[in-house]
A protein has these predicted regions:
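Cytosolic, long alpha-helical scaffolding segments
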Residues: 1-175
Length: 175
């Protein structure tokens, strides 16, 4: 009986991991699409896709949150399992924000397109680093690889540096 319950719980955790992977892929798609819109001529279809992807990300967040709540209420996990579920809840919140930010980029695309090439290059490079962060963070979570998770911090520093460069370029263009 106890083994059956644990097996069911492990299956549910695997399902949670699979849903996190799907949500991460949606975030990657939204970021890639948003950046592509800023680099090229008008893409109404791609703009619509990014906004729809953000809606899918929002739905996925609710679905995963529901999975987590069911796991917490039905299984009453402790220690490591509780940390896994609480980490998943934090991750989905962060990934949902990434989807929102991709939508924001789409809305700002007309202004970004008018910017200089260096600005766009930094933005594109920053987006690529964010995609790597999303991919590596989910992969480290699913594999429970602490060292890989620590390496994600490096990407965060790189993204911060790109962001600072973009802000500098933006200030230069205003002056």
């Amino acid at each position: 009986m106890v083994d059956d319950m644990r097996n069911k719980f492990d299956e549910q955790l695997d399902n949670l991991n699979n849903e996190l992977i799907k949500m991460g892929k949606l975030c990657e798609r939204a970021i890639s699409g948003a950046i592509k819109i800023t680099m090229e001529d008008d893409h109404e279809e791609l703009k619509r896709e990014v906004l729809e992807t953000d809606s899918e990300i929002d739905k996925k967040e609710r679905d995963i949150e529901s999975i987590c709540m069911k796991l917490l209420l039905r299984q009453q996990p402790v220690a490591r399992d509780l940390r896994v579920i609480s980490s998943a809840l934090k991750m989905i919140s962060d990934m949902e924000r990434i989807g929102d930010q991709a939508s924001d980029i789409v809305e700002l695309a007309q202004y970004i397109k008018k910017s200089d090439v260096k600005y766009k290059t930094h933005l594109s490079d920053m987006a690529n680093e964010v995609i790597k962060m999303v991919t590596k963070s989910i992969k480290s979570f699913v594999k429970k690889d602490i060292e890989m998770a620590r390496n994600v911090i490096v990407y965060d520093d790189v993204v911060d540096n790109y962001f600072e460069e973009i802000k500098k370029e933006d200030r230069k263009s205003v002056v």
